[in-house]
């Protein structure tokens, strides 16, 4: 497609300027509504609350009702995020809400929230139970969890830390893993630097000994 060819050309031109001329693989285009993680901004307003994304290089929150690239499960959390802003933030504070899809559920990490009382924590747990949120971390403390928010990596089920980096789409992750497995070929000893949660190390471990570092 025009867009794929344009992206490859832009990358080739940039690398050629530093005398690098790698072989390029075909670009894999990901279908819409497949992004599985996003960071929302939420705050109280005079009339209630608002949830959206920060404008580029801006403190302005752009309120959204839809997002064509995001998994619908992500967007299903927005009414709950609005409640978080109403109940868990001061008038001037903006909540940073990092949400990740885990199966049919959500793993959510909230930063910049107010300190919660025991009664408020209980209320938030009830809110989560009425939504798709299976784990809620509030200012670095897990205050609600009904099930472990696991991710499949190779043959393993991994529960990443709240807000941990994952490839934006599962399809993209699968393509990268398949490419890495192809590149390492029959090698039996592998070192994985910056291994994160094990995106590459765990699938590789099915065929080789892996020393993973982060």
Residue ranges of model-derived segments:
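Accessory RNA-recognition modules of RNA-modification enzymes
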Residues: 1-214
């Amino acid at each position: 497609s025009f867009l794929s060819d344009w992206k490859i050309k832009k990358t080739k031109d940039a690398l050629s300027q530093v005398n690098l001329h790698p072989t390029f693989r075909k670009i894999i285009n990901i279908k819409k509504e497949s992004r599985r993680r996003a960071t929302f901004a939420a705050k109280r307003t005079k009339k209630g609350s608002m949830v959206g994304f920060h404008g580029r290089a801006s403190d302005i929150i752009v309120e959204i009702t839809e997002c064509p690239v995001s998994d619908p499960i992500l967007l299903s959390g927005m009414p709950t995020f609005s409640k978080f802003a109403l109940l868990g933030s001061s008038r001037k504070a903006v909540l940073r809400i990092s949400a990740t899809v885990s199966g049919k559920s959500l793993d959510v990490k909230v930063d910049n929230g107010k300190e919660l009382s025991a009664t408020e924590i209980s209320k938030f747990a009830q809110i989560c139970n009425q939504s798709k949120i299976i784990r809620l971390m509030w200012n670095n403390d897990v205050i609600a969890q009904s099930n472990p928010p696991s991710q499949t990596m190779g043959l393993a089920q991994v529960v990443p830390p709240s807000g941990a980096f994952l490839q934006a789409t599962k399809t993209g992750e699968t393509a990268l893993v398949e490419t890495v497995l192809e590149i390492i070929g029959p090698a039996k000893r592998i070192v994985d630097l910056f291994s994160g949660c094990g995106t590459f190390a765990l699938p590789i471990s099915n065929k080789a000994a892996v020393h993973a570092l982060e």
